[in-house]
């Protein structure tokens, strides 16, 4: 949901002089401005982004990789039974399926072991270890978990089991004895492997093993699973992640995995490309829905079967669970919104809401929706029984969830997370004290923000510039995701010629700017309030496919009333009135003195008349700031 104009604080980027060296990339000025502001300051940096270096030999980056490969090769040669112990999210399930598929191809007998989100909780546990040992399993490989399972690892050591841990979660200070550990933190500083998720580590292990066995036929399908899991887990799209995604995403459409073909079919992707967006918004949710509501073994079976009919039946089960997940999310969101809105103007700065019947598997999704709706940190709690509640926490940019939970650790039984999201378990009698402490922290943060949500566009683009050629150049910067988001553009003085509230509370606009017109969509707007006739919009550019047609449209992140006749600009504690006369910039100071200039795309102004201070650095910087604020510079 977009923040209302009254709830926003726009922070426009500083004007930038495009480095002439960057123009050799063939990209247009708005995209070059985005890249230069992100730190890509020369041609070599942009080339490294567009065409990353091949992955270096992983054996030089993971100290224990050789030991892990040697033990797994022995298992493959002997047809040994072993367990792949995964996690119930998309990263963990794709990691499990990846290793199961490769190890079967190489002669081992792997079995998937993934705990239930509802019955078992996260990760490897002692009961699982003992059950596997009783069943004759002597080799365990964890994927996307393991480093936090101290008791389980100690029990495996006592039972003389060989354990290979592959995990990307925070390493504890000390680990029990292991055969091998593959973890990004074990790689050298600045290693391109540092950003790997669980599925990336599984892929590294699978590649090294297959090459050691001189049998690489199954690696193409392993790469497909790497792409799905990496995007689903929102791993940073840097280093080898970016290199392998650039190589692998174009092949997903024709994947040899029957399960992936079936998922494309049930997701309605038959005639659409399978890019990072399709993975993140169409395929990954159908996989994650199983981990949230069902048995993760369903996904492992789907992604390892070679039977097309079986794959389609399993994919349909994923689709059914995904629909159930959507219905649950909508119902819980409606209840949560009602609770928040019942407080009216007395709304707490930290939204902590609890209902015993809410489903643990989906409250994190709903918490994220509420963050978008209200711009506040949110914790949703559901009952675990025995007087305990388990929570999912989400927060806006700038509010550190992990630090907030650590500050409340004395009130919590368990907690964990990172700056944007986390979770905790708390006893019911501690909730009031917990909420008070979280409110204090959120109130301090809100005051620092001025109570407004920050909107930070990266480059100015006029509507007439949003052509198919612009879209093609934007696609050269893909894939987008964590660490490399799709650019947030802005455009000024757009006239709203049509406004329609769609089913689901989405707002559709037709925007006009001169002779150019574009359709825009604001997801989950949820309001029929009248908008200003002329607006500035912050947006990401999307390609909308519908009924066999393709059309560029703006996906709105924010809008505000255009400055109209002008705006007040502050610089160095001095105030100036800034306005436009066509494409001419007009600046007046408190004494009524006036500057007029014609800014170029970067904000550099040619003054309309000779002015004694026209070349002074302060005046030039003032002109650039004013040109940016009025939408005359990128």
Predicted region positions:
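An acidic intrinsically disordered interaction segment
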Residues: 1-12, 157-174, 249, 253
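Hydrophobic helix-and-loop "lid/oligomerization" segment in the mid-to-C-terminal part
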Residues: 2-5, 13-138, 211-431, 450, ...
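Acidic, two-metal ion nucleic-acid-processing modules in DNA metabolism proteins
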Residues: 37, 242-337, 372, 393-415, ...
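Short alpha-helices
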Residues: 98, 176-215, 219-231
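Conserved acidic residues
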Residues: 138, 179, 536
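Histidine/acidic-residue-rich, glycine-tolerant segments that coordinate divalent metal ions
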Residues: 143-197
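A short acidic, amphipathic alpha-helical/loop segment
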Residues: 151-155, 366, 469
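Histidine-centered active-site/metal-ligand motif
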Residues: 168-169, 359, 418, 506
């Amino acid at each position: 949901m977009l923040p209302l104009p009254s709830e926003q604080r726009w922070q426009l980027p500083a004007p930038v002089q495009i480095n002439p060296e960057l123009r050799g990339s063939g990209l247009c000025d708005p995209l070059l401005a985005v890249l230069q502001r992100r730190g890509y300051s020369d041609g070599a940096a942009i080339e490294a982004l567009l065409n990353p270096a091949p992955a270096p030999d992983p054996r030089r980056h993971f100290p224990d990789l050789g030991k892990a490969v040697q033990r797994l090769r022995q298992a493959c040669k002997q047809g040994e039974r072993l367990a792949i112990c995964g996690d119930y999210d998309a990263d963990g399930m794709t990691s499990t399926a990846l290793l199961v598929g490769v190890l079967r191809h190489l002669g081992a007998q792997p079995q998937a072991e993934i705990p239930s989100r509802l019955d078992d909780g996260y990760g490897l546990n002692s009961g699982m270890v003992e059950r596997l040992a009783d069943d004759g399993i002597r080799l365990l490989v964890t994927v996307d978990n393991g480093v936090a399972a101290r008791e389980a690892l100690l029990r495996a050591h006592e039972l003389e089991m060989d354990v290979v841990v592959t995990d990307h979660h925070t390493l504890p200070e000390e680990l029990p004895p292991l055969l091998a550990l593959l973890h990004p933190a074990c790689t050298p500083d600045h290693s391109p492997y540092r950003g790997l998720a669980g599925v990336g580590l599984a892929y590294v292990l699978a590649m090294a093993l297959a090459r050691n066995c001189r049998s690489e036929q199954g690696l193409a399908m392993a790469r497909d699973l790497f792409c799905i899991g990496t995007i689903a887990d929102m791993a940073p799209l840097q280093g080898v992640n970016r290199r392998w995604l650039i190589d692998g995403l174009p092949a997903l459409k024709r994947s040899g995995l029957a399960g992936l073909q079936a998922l494309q079919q049930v997701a309605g992707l038959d005639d659409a490309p399978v890019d990072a967006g399709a993975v993140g918004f169409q395929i990954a949710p159908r996989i994650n829905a199983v981990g949230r509501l069902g048995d993760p073994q369903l996904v492992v079976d789907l992604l390892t079967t070679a039977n097309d009919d079986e794959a389609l039946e399993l994919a349909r089960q994923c689709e059914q669970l995904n629909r159930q997940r959507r219905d649950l999310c909508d119902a819980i969101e409606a209840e949560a919104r009602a609770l928040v809105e019942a407080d009216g103007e007395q709304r707490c700065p930290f939204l902590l809401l609890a209902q015993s019947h809410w489903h643990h598997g989906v409250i994190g999704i709903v918490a994220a929706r509420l963050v978008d709706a209200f711009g506040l940190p949110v914790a949703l709690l559901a009952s675990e029984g025995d007087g305990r509640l388990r929570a999912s926490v989400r927060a806006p940019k700038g509010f550190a969830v992990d630090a907030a939970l650590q500050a409340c650790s004395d009130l919590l039984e368990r907690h964990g997370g990172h700056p944007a999201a986390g979770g905790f378990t708390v006893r019911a009698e501690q909730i009031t004290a917990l909420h008070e402490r979280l409110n204090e922290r959120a109130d301090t943060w809100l005051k620092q923000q001025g109570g407004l949500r920050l909107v930070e566009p990266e480059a100015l683009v006029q509507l007439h510039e949003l052509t198919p050629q612009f879209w093609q150049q934007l696609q050269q910067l893909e894939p987008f995701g964590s660490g490399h988001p799709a650019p947030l553009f802005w455009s000024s003085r757009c006239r709203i010629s049509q406004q329609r509230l769609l089913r689901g509370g989405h707002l559709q606009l037709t925007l006009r700017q001169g002779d150019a017109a574009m359709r825009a969509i604001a997801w989950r707007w949820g309001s029929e309030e009248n908008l200003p006739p002329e607006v500035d919009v912050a947006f990401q550019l999307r390609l909308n496919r519908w009924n066999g047609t393709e059309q560029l449209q703006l996906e709105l992140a924010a809008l505000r009333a255009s400055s109209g006749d002008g705006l007040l600009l502050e610089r160095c504690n001095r105030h100036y009135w800034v306005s436009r006369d066509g494409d001419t910039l007009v600046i007046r100071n408190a004494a009524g003195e006036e500057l007029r200039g014609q800014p170029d795309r970067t904000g550099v102004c040619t003054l309309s008349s000779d002015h004694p201070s026209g070349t002074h650095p302060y005046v030039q910087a003032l002109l650039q700031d004013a040109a940016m604020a009025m939408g005359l510079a990128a």
